């Protein structure tokens, strides 16, 4: 599309900074927290990841939409972002899997975007001053008028956005990672009886469910406000706490449930929001990072093993608040030394701040799914032996 045919658009940040560009996707006005993602690939997975609910995403890679979109790469049923910001947009994608252009896809789902702005300068600003609310509009092109709406919007801290993305009904997930994309999980973990995992849905990504299914798990997904009693009625071999959006300290229903589930002594595995929820259940606190971690190359580790990980989060666990007698740090983010993993000292319970399913991203941490399966099998065998 020639720029002469593009509709003008305006981006205004909460501090009054304004950027003028052109519209792609839907027209209208949208307001959310402006954050940046440094990944070179996986824009469709980012746009449809429920963890981005309430946010406007700046893509730092200068080209966006070159490979179009397709139904298989969606992490949920629709885009979850409030808006998208890009340097350049491709209106005519070229890829054998593409079924639709990115602008048409966002227009279909009523998601506004702006392109043609200096995304490098915008990213540096967020990095220096922190993530902040912003607004994109094709209707309001007066900076002061749009700024007024942006400043009236609530901040991310204190928001429970899980209620907007969790499932409303219980369902069972059985689809594994598609064979053409399978990257050889440890086949030994599939041997034996199928394991039942109840996944508490705070905004779960489909590829996490696929990895659990690939490792031989029967996955039952339940709403975030499901009581511990209802969860335990399924007699699960393990419990999974999923990723999700917003402030973890505001998800009081999840924290209360996780705290009760700890008493069951069943294996528990948490990812991202689930990691933070578990931290709260164990007595820790979380805090908001200046601009968060969003990208595909975050190093994490503690000993001599380092994993390159995919991350997407605004909050982190305060290490000084962890009860040292109960839990230990298993991983640190090696860029800023924030907590990236927890492990219970006596129970089969662990969590990571990053995404081991890595869709997109490196597969360094896929072993964590095998570790979860191993803990479930070991616990099940020990329980069976005690009964017999």
Curated annotation (Swiss-Prot):
InterPro entries: Anth_synth/Amidotransfase, CarbamoylP_synth_ssu, CarbamoylP_synth_ssu_N, CarbP_synth_ssu_N_sf, Class_I_gatase-like, CPSase_GATase1, GATASE. Keywords: Amino-acid biosynthesis, Arginine biosynthesis, ATP-binding, Glutamine amidotransferase, Ligase, Nucleotide-binding, Pyrimidine biosynthesis. It catalyses: hydrogencarbonate + L-glutamine + 2 ATP + H2O = carbamoyl phosphate + L-glutamate + 2 ADP + phosphate + 2 H(+). L-glutamine binds at residues 51, 244, 246, 273, 276, 312, 315. Residues 196-382 form the Glutamine amidotransferase type-1 domain. Its EC number is 6.3.5.5. Residues 1-192 are annotated as: CPSase. One of its GO terms (molecular function) is carbamoyl-phosphate synthase (glutamine-hydrolyzing) activity. It is an enzyme of class 6 (ligase). Belongs to the CarA family. NCBIfam families: CPSaseIIsmall, PRK12838.1. This is Carbamoyl phosphate synthase small chain.
